[in-house]
């Protein structure tokens, strides 16, 4: 069974690094992927996209037994609009948005664990919850 569900941005600049990062942590072949512009941001505003994402998670939960959702956001994401170019500010804002998305997902899927990571242009992965800002 596949225990993990990855939500990541469709931005080509971060695809390879994200999959490599997952492989290095033993997730190779152990995750379903939803790659969508803005990653989990659509859970916060657009009803149609929110429904799409939640339906994908529900499908994976029912058919693949997922227990964990791993969210990746990245630096300089066009879906975030015009925000600060300062990496630390972006990390803080993205972690806030991912936490909001987590609350939406946990409301629908209370038994699913959620992990959140921000990826910098230097391909450094910053887990949410670490006091780095």
For each predicted feature, which ranges?
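Divalent-metal-activated hydrolytic enzyme cores
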Residues: 1-4, 9-18, 37-51, 61-67, ...
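Short Gly/aromatic-enriched secondary-structure transition segments
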Residues: 19-25
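Short glycine/proline-enriched loop/turn "hinge" motifs that connect secondary-structure elements
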Residues: 25-28, 63-64
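Short, contiguous, well-structured surface segments enriched in hydrophobic/aromatic residues
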Residues: 31-34
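Acidic beta-strand-to-loop metal/phosphate-binding motif
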Residues: 68-74
